[in-house]
């Protein structure tokens, strides 16, 4: 036991330092022998070991291996980099050094064997290097055999074949390792070169890369264990960029990234930045050291937003990204996020959050937002200060700005991830910041008289804050984590729509969406705020999008729900149009992560419509192709953005997977509806029963809507101040959602006269009324119930929407061709549901009508065998067209089959090997759709969009699908 205790005491003793660095030797102070040493770290000296020791200078024995002649071995980062960039070299090094090792002998430490030296032998150093190479090789290629049993030529040949795919992963690994580990062993050295202040951006960018590569040096480490003992928390050595470059990056942060997030005071920031550059780094005060991480973080974000989506200089773009990561790590190492109390520290955390968002690192971003929120709450930023609080005007306004910025980021990131918000509006009473420019807020007073009613950047941020307060309500009302029921009240949604309407009407003229002649100073803010508004609308209408599914039973569909589902598609199309405009005007880059998300979900929503659409007439087909074109436009926008940021790239890759999974269905639908003028294309199935409501049936509310809520929604829909009067989707659009079924000449006449009494000419029994809104340009926005549903035009017989049961009743009783369809939806209480199947007046009333449908589909619609109407193929086409035109959705709902999250399973006919697609005008080729493929495709579609919900709204949010 005493011997073990003595050995333990010896093991914890500090290792004797064999050599001090040049600076410590010069100043004759204790050195810890590290690279860099603690003394050089504290005083920002350059830590070198260049000067030879006196022992080396005086020694005449060339056989002694002294420290002055020790060759620096490779650091771990160097070895990892070598493994990733050139595995040939890694393998050859291991083989070569193992070949040398057996013949290596110990170098004599002295001519006198009685005084052995304790220096390393060449054999030991080689073994250490081999062990380190082998450790990395085993980690990079864990499934390969031992290096001695590896056929290196074969392996290298295979590696080169797959190099393109594997290189990206290895490069990313090396890059991340270099940023986190290698830089952490270097000290902070914010030293300005003699010509830094006069450097220009063009002169600086080419040279900065080489400076950063040579910023740190490495010493030989005895072994992997010795290397792991190096302090990881050591700060990073970074040379501040020239002032011109720093100002350029900071300006990019303010004017591109933080347009809607205002949490800084520009004059104060510039003043502290000037002091930083004018002060010797050795003489930095504690206040300047507190400002340094904020400066680094602002530069890091500015580097990301300096990347251009149109630049062809890949090396410059990669350099900017690397610079962003470098300064981000510098800021992160300098700040203690667990003890951030001052304004500069919390601002720095906010900048780090923005950087993480733009880099698509949402998990870390979520953690940092929580830290920032707790720091702000601990500092009392959420409480309103009294006039005699003792804080200066700048401090008071900064507290407001910081709190509301953190609050907005918290609401946004939790909406993205489907997680609870950190704070409720009932928990704070802080007022919004004053709408004053920074120059009009000083340390001693406010200067509102100098504002002259000019909209400030803080005023822009305030409008964004008001919008996010509404977003918070939407999430609370429509996406509660703890639900009391599955009921969504129409009144609740209507009140949220009206709040958005009031917010929109209260915007200053510079921020009104689609306003013309906008001052260039406000153009970017206008477009970004418009995009945020559309993003809020997407979340508002998202619970209704499943009403566009062909699996929905028409008799249980609430028209107001369907209308809002259509609004979600209209909003998505507006997002695509706006994003395309912003990209073309260089107002949007891939670093706007929330913009990429909004575009992504918009395209995904359009894809859902494309694969669930019913096209009963030419107008619907024309709209279908417009939406298909918009979806492809949105995808092309993401392609332009994906190379400018990691966030955009990840978003595009996820969307591309959806495109690939749904590609087969797109091909089928495109072939089916290849021409907007094709009115006779139809799909023959044995389940083509007309899902029209029975003449005596009344509209039944969906399962998750209460009867009282439905009544309220209907009464609201009829009134002038209803939600129909306010269509958020069309409020910003200059074009209708789809073609209006009314006579075009009548529409043009009424629009030209500026009348709004079109709803008075409608059937009073129709639930939805028409609105015409004239915008500032004199253009009309026509809003109709039939804008939000599919329109069917059966020749001279006008029919209204699928939910206008009065018109359906008239159409059913006055059908001009009674031989066409004689089963007017026989689903009456007490009757067999199988009677709903169309048999085309066949005498076969058996429950299984597969034979009839087989005959209908046989020989290109020559269904004369079981059809009492012995007309020619043209009559058969007319019959099938009328069958389709009187079919609300054309798909039977099977409530007993499995479903995806409440979506009823699509019942596919099993009696036919394929489904023939006929085209009267031969505008599209005939294709065959296998039943099994169609079944699988339907499952894939619903499964993909269920995954999409999980990706975008988190697993904690309800999908709000109707339960059967």
From Swiss-Prot:
In terms of InterPro entries, this protein maps to: Stress_Response_Reg, Transcription_factor_dom_fun, Zn2-C6_fun-type_DNA-bd_sf, Zn2Cys6_DnaBD
Chain residues forming the annotated DNA-binding region: 21-47
**Which PROSITE patterns does the record associate with it?**
ZN2_CY6_FUNGAL_1, ZN2_CY6_FUNGAL_2
Q: Which GO terms describe its cellular component?
A: nucleus
Q: Result of mutating residue 682 to S?
A: In strain: SK1
Q: What does this protein do?
A: Probable transcription factor involved in the stress response.
The protein's predominant localisation is nucleus
Quote the biased-composition stretches of kind Low complexity, using this chain's numbering: 800-896
- Renumbered to this chain, region (Disordered) spans 104-125, 190-225, 733-764, 800-900
Ranges of Polar residues compositional bias? 190-201, 209-225, 733-759
What GO terms are given for molecular function?
A: DNA-binding transcription factor activity, RNA polymerase II-specific; sequence-specific DNA binding; zinc ion binding
In the UniProt record for this chain, what is stated about the effect of gene disruption? No growth on non-fermentable carbon sources like glycerol and lactate and sensitivity to calcofluor white.
A UniProt-annotated Pfam family: Fungal_trans
Species source reads Saccharomyces cerevisiae (strain ATCC 204508 / S288c) (Baker's yeast)
Q: Which GO terms describe its biological process?
A: DNA-templated transcription; positive regulation of transcription by RNA polymerase II
**Keyword annotations of the record:** DNA-binding, Metal-binding, Nucleus, Phosphoprotein, Stress response, Transcription, Transcription regulation, Zinc
Known outcome of mutating residue 811 to S: In strain: SK1
Gene that this polypeptide is encoded by? ASG1
User: What is the recorded phenotype of mutating residue 353 to F?
Assistant: In strain: SK1
Q: What family does the Swiss-Prot or TrEMBL record give for this protein? A: Belongs to the ASG1 family.
| Other comment | Present with 396 molecules/cell in log phase SD medium.
List localization entries. Nucleus
Q: PTM Phosphoserine: list the residues.
A: 166, 186, 963
Annotated disulfide bonds: none
What protein am I looking at?
A: Activator of stress genes 1
**Stated consequence of mutating residue 149 to S:** In strain: SK1
